[in-house]
Each structure stands twice: as structure tokens, then as C-alpha cells.
Amino acid sequence: TGEEAGIYYIVMELVEGITLKEYIKMKGRLSVREATSIALQISAGLEAAHNNGIIHRDIKPQNIIISTDGKVKVADFGIARASSGNTINSSVMGSVHYSSPEQSRGGYSDQKSDIYSLGITMYEMLTGHVPFDGDTAVAVALKHLQEDLKGPKELIPEIPNSTNAIVLK
């Protein structure tokens, strides 16, 4: 970051590759091994953000980039907030398919909200689709609030119990 002649700027890394969403669409669904590897890299990125007091608030496959050399990067911190600051959602909220129940209610977002969204992302990697869908954003948000998440193992029986438990955590 810096300032030059009264103009502020941020220098960011250029990451060439594809989004995790595109990758899932190409493959249909990922193997447990591959999904776990990607989830671990996302977790490391979230840990770095959280350790620096930043909550992402919009973790989803569209905001995860897989570089051409296979590295996974968490991108688009556009609605991120400092965890020490006001993290009450106003009109800005993460994508409804990946939003935590707290975000769906318009309430407090913290590190747990990012972890919930990571769980939904893992579910999509393992099954090829999101667990809750609907005709409107409100319908999807209500499902996050009112319905229990079914484990990915119910759709893909070969998913290990341990992986299923992590997604449901």
C-alpha cells in the first residue's frame, strides 16, 4: 500500500489460474484427497487473515483461486472487516449459498462465519453442488436458518466418516 501525489493504492499479487468454482464445474466433484488438500490451503489463508484481525465474510468457491502451479489463494476481501471493529452486517452480506446462519439473520459475523462458509465450500467440492438451494436468496437464507445440513456422505457414501464430520462441524 502507499500514496503517490494524493492517490492511495494497493499493490496485489497477480494470480493466474481458475476459480475453485470453475474447477468444480470442470470436474463435477473432487476426490476426498483433493478437496482436503484445497480445504487445508484455504484454512491456512483464513488462519493468516484471522490472526491479523480480519474476517473475510464471503468465503465461496468463486473467491478461491487455484493458480497454474496448483497453489490455492483466498481472494476478494471486498467485504472483509476487522474483527476488532464493527462486524454487524448491514446491507453487505456474503453470498447467500455460503452464508452462516448469523449472516443470514443479519447479525454478528466472526471467524466462525468464515469456518461455516468453508464447510459449505467443502460440501460443494465433495458433492458438486451446494447443500441448500432455492428460487430466491431469502429462500436459501431460510434453509440455512431452519434446516439441518445433511452430510455429504448421504450423497456420496464413500466419503469417510471423519471427512463428513469435519464438513458438518
Feature map (PLM): residue ranges:
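Conserved ATP-binding/catalytic core of the eukaryotic-like protein kinase fold
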Residues: 1-139, 144
